[in-house]
């Protein structure tokens, strides 16, 4: 799995003109699923995300997790994280998992996250408009194959 984490003060996802999910303080996740991803990758990602200390403590030091600050997560499926740009000018997305597998793992990932923090989601495979106010900015790329 490849996941882009962005610390936000607010974020929302709009589908066909209607807000489908929104959060205040927390994390916006752009989630890509690869063909070799498994439950082990999912568990690793969830553990890292809910415990990652990227929110400021009273001294201004990044020392708190999304759980510690009672934050929320907005999770958006993003197969384009697996883009291959080696040849030509049109990216190839053959490195992403097939939609059936990706959808299953994405749903399981969000379910696992929701055991720790409130989670809002987009719609898998939909065209979405994502809005955010990046806080910091703090943006981190998590790749479960680079443990």
UniProtKB/Swiss-Prot annotation:
**What does the entry list under GO cellular component?**
cytoplasm
Give the motif span (Gly-cisPro motif, important for rejection of L-amino acids).
136-137
According to its UniProt record, the EC number is: 3.1.1.96
What is its subcellular localisation?
Answer: Cytoplasm
Q: Which UniProt keywords apply?
A: Cytoplasm, Hydrolase, RNA-binding, tRNA-binding
An MF annotation (GO) of this entry: tRNA binding
Quote the InterPro entries the UniProt record gives: Daa-tRNA_deacyls_DTD, DTD-like_sf
Q: Which domain of life is it from?
A: Bacteria
Which Gene3D superfamilies does the record cross-reference, listed alphabetically? D-tyrosyl-tRNA(Tyr) deacylase
Tell me the enzyme class: hydrolase
Q: Does the keyword rRNA processing apply?
A: no
Q: Which GO terms describe its biological process?
A: D-amino acid catabolic process
Task: Report the catalytic activity.
Answer: glycyl-tRNA(Ala) + H2O = tRNA(Ala) + glycine + H(+); a D-aminoacyl-tRNA + H2O = a tRNA + a D-alpha-amino acid + H(+)
Subunit structure of this chain's protein: Homodimer.
Alphabetized PANTHER family for the sequence: D-AMINOACYL-TRNA DEACYLASE 1, D-TYROSYL-TRNA TYR DEACYLASE
Q: What free text does the record give on domains? A: A Gly-cisPro motif from one monomer fits into the active site of the other monomer to allow specific chiral rejection of L-amino acids.
Task performed by this protein = An aminoacyl-tRNA editing enzyme that deacylates mischarged D-aminoacyl-tRNAs. Also deacylates mischarged glycyl-tRNA(Ala), protecting cells against glycine mischarging by AlaRS. Acts via tRNA-based rather than protein-based catalysis; rejects L-amino acids rather than detecting D-amino acids in the active site. By recycling D-aminoacyl-tRNA to D-amino acids and free tRNA molecules, this enzyme counteracts the toxicity associated with the formation of D-aminoacyl-tRNA entities in vivo and helps enforce protein L-homochirality.
Record-linked NCBIfam families? D-aminoacyl-tRNA deacylase (TIGR00256)
- Family the entry assigns: Belongs to the DTD family.
- Protein name, please? D-aminoacyl-tRNA deacylase
Q: Which organism is it from?
A: Streptococcus suis (strain 05ZYH33)
* Designated gene of the protein: dtd
């Amino acid at each position: 799995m490849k996941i882009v984490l962005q610390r936000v003060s607010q974020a929302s996802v709009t589908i066909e003109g209607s807000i489908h999910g929104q959060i205040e303080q927390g994390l916006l996740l752009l989630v890509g699923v690869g063909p070799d991803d498994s439950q082990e990758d999912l568990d690793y990602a969830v553990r890292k995300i809910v415990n990652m200390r990227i929110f400021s403590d009273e001294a201004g030091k990044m020392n708190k997790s999304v759980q510690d600050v009672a934050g929320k997560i907005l999770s958006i499926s993003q197969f384009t994280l697996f883009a291959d740009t080696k040849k030509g000018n049109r990216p190839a997305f053959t490195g992403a998992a097939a939609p059936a597998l990706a959808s299953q793992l994405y749903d399981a990932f969000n379910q696992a996250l929701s055991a720790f923090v409130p989670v809002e989601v987009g719609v898998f495979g939909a065209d979405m408009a994502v809005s955010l106010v990046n806080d910091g900015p703090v943006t981190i790329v998590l790749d479960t194959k680079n443990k």
